[in-house]
Regions:
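Serine-hydrolase catalytic core recognition
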Residues: 115-116, 123, 129, 261-458
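A short beta-strand motif characteristic of beta-propeller blades
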Residues: 20-24, 101-105, 151-154, 158-159, ...
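N-terminal targeting or regulatory segments adjacent to alpha/beta-hydrolase or S9 domains
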Residues: 48, 55-56, 214-306
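Short, solvent-exposed loop/turn and secondary-structure capping segments
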Residues: 5, 10-13, 48, 55-61, ...
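Short loop/turn segments that connect beta-strands within beta-propeller blades
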Residues: 12-15, 94-98, 144-148, 195-198, ...
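Structural motif
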Residues: 4-8, 54-60, 87-89, 135-142, ...
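Conserved beta-propeller blade repeats
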Residues: 1-2, 27-45, 74-83, 87-89, ...
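Predominantly five- to eight-bladed beta-propeller fold
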Residues: 19-37, 47-103, 292-308, 360-371
Length: 458
């Protein structure tokens, strides 16, 4: 437990001795973390020691506190870009001998984050993950519980940035092997790493497509089940498919081959799954499948939208056009109002969110996509677009955002809207507006500041 910023141990039986300090150097500004992780054999403890930084503070006003009539002022630490950040380092205690085992933590100072990720089952050591500030290096380290030596199991580096939000790690055989997600070949794929040497044993998936999410790992069968997108060249590259592959990279299967965005629900034993697939222009279909087989066992339900159509509802249109380089496909969706009349001229509004952490245009069927369809009902053609600089395409596509957030994919977005207007004459590109929330609000302001020859209002 932690008391006065230091680590103490004591018997659960109060009659068996006094508390013993394992550390004595903890202070208010340089303290030991309360997350104390015991080794499985109960002989060691791992935790973090954190050195606080002199941080800016911002005031927050609670207008109607329960404790008093007057508003209440609170202060919160709030670092700004470029400020010094807190630094955490791993710490190892030997409980049997009531001492701290020294670790060489030089090299981990300039950090965005450092977190402990648990002990090995045999108590030989524990692991941590280190994200260097600037996101150009990401390390998985292992601390030897006997001598405190640190070795790097994964040392991921990038000349631009590592998309750490997409990191995936799965330790096999108590860390003898590691399954790891990386964009090191230009696309987000899975690798098998030797847990002793840190060397790549083999690349598990490869190709001009991306692994989106690992669903589960069957260690016994040495098989991985995951969602992937971009598999089929003639399909929207953001559509997700449920796939599987062996650890050695053989036996790849797309278990959900329909041209759509798939969501799966597994049975408890994972031998069957419900596949619900749709697109913005395809109502949902729910089918039952058996794991490892492409064929459909039963169609469970098909969405009937005849009543929607009878009311004049307009199906959103998935649209693709070339981006700024004249080569790269840019994908988005067009929304039209219920009373749409192709003989009229309509102003265009882009609903934007260009945050680089993800892609943002919905790929599912949604008859009332409130942020777009509601605006369309006011008499606009509304568009949503994933331009360069957003996630879930190639690393090159994503890297456009690096040190360049103001770009927000605008050269691609403008090309896309112009291409749509050439096809649909009712889209009036002399009247283009834009709006968004959060990062989308920043993007909307950037549109007026840097591209006001095209965007007229925000």
């Amino acid at each position: 437990y932690i008391r006065d910023n230091n680590v103490y141990i004591a018997s659960s039986d109060k009659n068996q001795g006094e508390e013993v300090p394992l550390s004595i150097d903890g202070t208010f500004d340089c303290f030991y973390d309360a997350n104390l992780i015991w080794s499985p054999d109960s002989k060691k403890i791992a935790t973090l020691k954190t050195r606080q930084a002199n941080c800016r503070r911002i005031p927050l006003l609670e207008s109607a506190p329960k404790t008093q009539l007057q508003p209440l002022l609170h202060w919160r630490n709030y670092a700004k870009p470029g400020d010094v950040l807190p630094v955490s380092v791993p710490v190892l205690f030997d409980v049997e001998h009531c001492k701290q085992i020294p670790l060489d933590t030089r090299g981990y100072e300039n950090q965005f984050s450092l977190s402990l990720t648990g002990w090995r089952e045999d108590s030989r050591g524990f692991t941590f993950e280190f994200n260097r500030r600037g996101h150009q290096q990401y390390i998985v380290g292992e601390v030897n519980a006997q001598n405190g030596m640190i070795r790097h199991l994964v040392d991921e580096k990038s000349d631009t940035f590592i998309s750490y939000i997409n990191n995936y790690r799965y330790d096999l055989n108590d860390g003898m092997e590691i399954l790891w997600m990386s964009e090191r070949d230009g696309w987000r794929h899975l690798y098998r790493i030797d847990g002793k040497t840190g060397e790549v044993k083999n690349q598990i998936t490869r190709g001009e497509w991306v692994v989106r999410k690992v669903i589960f790992v069957d260690a016994g069968q040495q098989r991985i089940y995951f969602m992937a997108s971009g598999l089929n060249k003639k399909e929207d590259p953001y559509n997700q498919h449920y796939c599987c592959v062996n650890f050695d990279g053989t036996g790849f299967q797309d278990l959900t081959p329909e041209n759509a965005n798939h969501k799966v629900i597994l049975s408890k034993d994972r031998s069957y799954f419900v596949d619900v697939y749709s697109r913005p222009d395809l109502p949902p279909v729910s089918v039952l499948r058996k794991l490892g087989e492409k064929k459909v066992i039963a169609t469970l339900e098909k969405c009937d939208i005849s009543d929607l159509k009878a009311q004049g509802w307009q199906m959103p249109e998935v649209f693709c056009a070339k981006g700024r380089d004249g080569k790269t496909d840019i994908w988005g969706t067009i929304y039209r109002p219920f009373n749409f009349d192709p003989s009229k001229s309509y102003p265009v509004v882009e609903n934007i969110y260009a945050g680089p952490h993800d892609s943002h245009v919905s790929k599912d069927f949604n008859p009332i996509e409130w942020s777009s369809s509601s605006l369309a009902e006011l008499g606009y053609i509304v568009v949503r677009i994933d331009g360069m600089g957003t996630n879930n395409r190639s690393k090159k596509f994503h890297d456009v955002c690096w040190k360049n957030l103001k770009d927000a994919g605008f050269p691609d977005r403008i090309k896309w809207i112009q291409a749509a207007a050439r096809k649909y004459k009712y889209m009036d590109t002399s009247r283009v507006g834009i709006y968004g929330w959060s990062a989308g609000g920043q993007n909307a302001m950037a549109a007026l500041l840097f591209h006001n020859d095209f965007y007229k209002a925000a």
